[in-house]
Curated annotation (Swiss-Prot):
InterPro entries: DUF2759 (IPR024490). GO terms for cellular component: plasma membrane. This is Uncharacterized protein YqgW. The chain crosses the membrane at residues 2-22, 29-49. It is a multi-pass membrane protein. Keywords: Cell membrane, Membrane, Transmembrane, Transmembrane helix. It is found in: Cell membrane.
């Protein structure tokens, strides 16, 4: 379950990157941070739904 925590932190940093790139009007940064947020956020949410938190045995 540590992997989900790490990917969740990556998703939070990507959210910070999205907000920062919007504030600085950086289109490429927005696209890359948005893609990272989508991928890692989706993986985190679906893993928690599938396995539960804490991990179901």
């Amino acid at each position: 379950m540590l992997l989900v925590v790490i990917f969740g932190l990556v998703a939070l940093f990507a959210l910070w990157g999205v907000l920062r790139s919007v504030r600085n009007k950086n289109i490429l940064g927005f696209l890359l941070a948005g893609a990272t947020l989508f991928v890692f956020g989706w993986f985190t949410v679906m893993t928690v739904i599938n396995s539960g938190y804490p991990t179901a045995h």
